[in-house]
Amino acid sequence: YGSHYGERDDLFRPDADSREISALSHEQLINSYDNTILATDDFLADIIDLLRDRRAIMIYYSDHGESLGENGRYLHGAENAPLHHPAAMIWWSDEYEKTYPARVEAMRANRHRRAKTTSAFHTVLDAAGIDSPVLDREASLVSHGYRRP
């Protein structure tokens, strides 16, 4: 994890001092992972700052979850539950909300609903207002017709 964050996000210590997982303690792995989360948070905050004064939406999907010692498993190479619940978020500017209130209303209505990464494609198309024969609004979190894929 150490290569995924810089000094500004190196808060949790001790962190990884080796690329060999077996050489690291549970605490080092957790701290290193937490530092990567700080780096991701900072990155997303920087993007939001760039978009804040525009009519814009940001959609973030993590590509996978992470195992942090559950059942003795670490990282994301094994098939287990934490990998099936990756992080996701949608942020929109005030200007986007003023321009597309129905889209924002639908996103708010769907905010606690489960989603799969397969909905990302349809959500992005719908949020951008791209109408296409391949757009499935039942797979879009921007739609009142959303149904978990």
Predicted regions located by residue number:
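Catalytic domains that recognize anionic headgroups
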Residues: 1-149
